[in-house]
Amino acid sequence: MDQDYGLWPLVIINSLLLIVFAGSFFHPRTQRDWRAMGAYSAFVIALFTEMYGAPLTIYLLSGWLGSRFPALQATHSGGHLWNDLIGWTGDPHMSPFHLASYAVIGGGFWLIAVAWKHLHAAAQNGRLATTGPYAWLRHPQYLGFLLVMAGWLLQWPTIPTLLMFPILAVVYARLARTEEREIATTFAPEWADYARRVPRYVPRKPARSLTADNSVEPDHTSVRM
């Protein structure tokens, strides 16, 4: 095996770092929160297992596509599949896919962190969280996790993580629906109006309403995700 692989201590260290890093933003408390973290953790472990441990995807594709894409080799540089497929010859860490991944991953972590601040503030006051990211969509933290995973797929796609991503998206969707049923019983009047105005997953600019003096103000009220 190439010296770039079989580095199991790096698999463990990097996996732990990213899992703890996400947890510091997400602050899991309930069983549902831990399921969300568990889904993300499984993705991260699968990612770094191929990045530094055993490059299963490279082995499978090199025999099939090796003659057409000579850069597709069992090396760390060869693991940047998008670069191999588009023929990028420069530093793989400076490719368009790699740079885009930084923005998507960073945006995902930012969304998780900012959403938690608004969620925590609302919980402290016994209110429904509908300010900040929650004014744009009902489940910003789940979307944040999906953005982080999508960013890693831009940077280092593998067969296992590509297969896992849609499955994890369904897992988060089911968690969101379960959560909404619970929230609806706690914040019945507010939730019905909030759910009517704010989309579940796709961000939408908050509606604006006219006040008594005809000035325009954001229409928001201030539950995890």
Predicted regions mapped to residue ranges:
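Membrane-anchoring alpha-helices and their flanking helix-loop junctions
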Residues: M1-T130, V148-M225
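Short alpha-helical H-box segment flanking the phosphoacceptor histidine in two-component systems
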Residues: P133
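Histidine-centered phosphotransfer motif of kinases
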Residues: W136-L143
